[in-house]
């Protein structure tokens, strides 16, 4: 098959399952087929393993499951979610994104909010470290506070644990098509950051959604 990128654009329905005859190379004489993931019955749909929703609901409904997982992932058993003067819990946010010019302004504005941001390695950790005035990304488990904002730097995680992070947070800021789908299955509010393409082609993809 020719596995293509996820999109909600109109061409996906037209192109899904079309043949792609191989005219040259080792596969000459064979036929590949275009497979387009998508959001309608005329596309390849979205991947979701059996039992995922049930596992998510069980995790989100189990008292103490989120805190126990966060203790393990952050590597600090003293980590606790904070509450405001009205006993309302803080907002827990996952940050997994590309380089984003608006990030410093968002972090600065978040200093006035009772909020903990879990910062993933890579683009996000480097950008947040720069905002903090650090020369490099801190070690996993490092915590910084600026006003009411708390920043916690995470270690790398594998896919099952990434799902648990998505399930744990009140808001997920994610990048790329695969993570957008996992954020959908998490059933939590999320913001999707597209990869910026030449000639602003990513805006057409965004408009289609």
Identify what each model region corresponds to:
Residues 12-22, 108-110, 129-143, 205:
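Short, aromatic/basic amphipathic alpha-helical patches
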Residues 156-205:
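A donor-sugar binding/catalytic signature common to diverse glycosyltransferases
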Residues 101-105, 126, 162, 180-181:
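Short, well-ordered alpha-helical microsegments
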Residues 5-7, 122-125, 177-179:
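Short, polar loop motifs at secondary-structure junctions
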